[in-house]
């Protein structure tokens, strides 16, 4: 787990004498790795690692130091083990409830057993399910998936929204019937504008993305950031890319936006520390 520090300037939330810290733990593409990976794997970086019990223990330790930490998943916690095959996501969701996730973005594998099953999982979950660039109003997911959620920590408002890749070609047609894909860039612009508006008033905006990293001639996190502004942090997934350190992409205003992604199976997770200070 890496320790990342970001400083985000806000206009009015703090005096010059004070600075507030937000802590985020992020996972992606854990793919139903409920049990640790086999200790017999040739890849010694993976052998015997991961597993939900380890993550639970780590989160317990982190919450002792940071009681108000936020916990996000960037998609594809589904599919990859007999637990998912047999129980169709119920095991994973119940364990994520135990871990006290705040929000997840829909990845493509969340649709592997269709939207009826996904609706069942959402109903048993205790966290928000996000996707700002899909319209599910003609499906059983209507009103169950939100474009964003607003969290508050120490009088700081954090807007968190999700982006899902185009599911055509990634999920069976019958499993996504009625779901309408919307352009991620335009969707992000609209939701960021709403989150930054006076009526919502977010101080920080975080994107949970399952678009992927370095997707050749396809929509990905770099393309998203380059064509938008107002996003402070992108937490990514989908391509199973492991960042040894944060990557930075210039947004439409020329500002560097940090991006994180942590491989797959939950072998690694991310920890972001955001220091919020006033802009004087």
Q: Where are these predicted regions, by residue range?
A:
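Bacterial Sec-dependent N-terminal signal peptides
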Residues: 1-21
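Acidic, metal/ion-coordinating pockets
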Residues: 19-280
């Amino acid at each position: 787990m890496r320790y990342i520090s970001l400083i985000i300037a806000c206009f009015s939330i703090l005096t010059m004498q004070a600075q507030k810290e937000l802590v985020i733990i992020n996972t992606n593409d854990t793919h139903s790795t409920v049990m640790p990976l086999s200790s017999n794997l040739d890849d010694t970086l993976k052998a015997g690692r991961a597993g939900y019990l380890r993550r639970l223990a780590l989160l317990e330790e982190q919450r002792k130091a940071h009681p108000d930490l936020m916990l996000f998943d960037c998609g594809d916690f589904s599919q990859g083990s007999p637990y998912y095959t047999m129980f169709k996501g119920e095991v994973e969701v119940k364990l994520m409830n135990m871990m006290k996730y705040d929000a997840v973005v829909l990845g493509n594998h969340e649709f592997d057993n269709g939207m009826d099953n996904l609706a069942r999982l959402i109903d048993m979950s205790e966290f928000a399910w996000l996707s700002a660039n899909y319209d599910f109003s003609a499906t059983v997911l209507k009103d169950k998936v939100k474009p964003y959620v607003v969290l508050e920590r120490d009088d700081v408002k954090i807007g968190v929204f999700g982006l899902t890749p185009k599911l055509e070609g990634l999920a069976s047609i019958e499993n996504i019937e009625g779901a309408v894909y919307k352009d991620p860039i335009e969707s992000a612009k609209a939701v960021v504008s709403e989150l930054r508006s006076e009526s919502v008033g977010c101080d920080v905006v975080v994107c949970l993305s399952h678009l992927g990293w370095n997707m050749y001639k396809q929509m990905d996190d770099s393309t998203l950031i380059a064509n938008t502004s107002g996003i402070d942090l992108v937490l990514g997934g989908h391509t199973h890319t492991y960042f040894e350190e944060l990557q930075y992409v210039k947004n439409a205003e020329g500002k560097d936006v940090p991006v994180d992604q942590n491989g797959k199976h939950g072998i690694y997770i991310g920890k972001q520390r955001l220091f919020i200070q006033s802009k004087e």
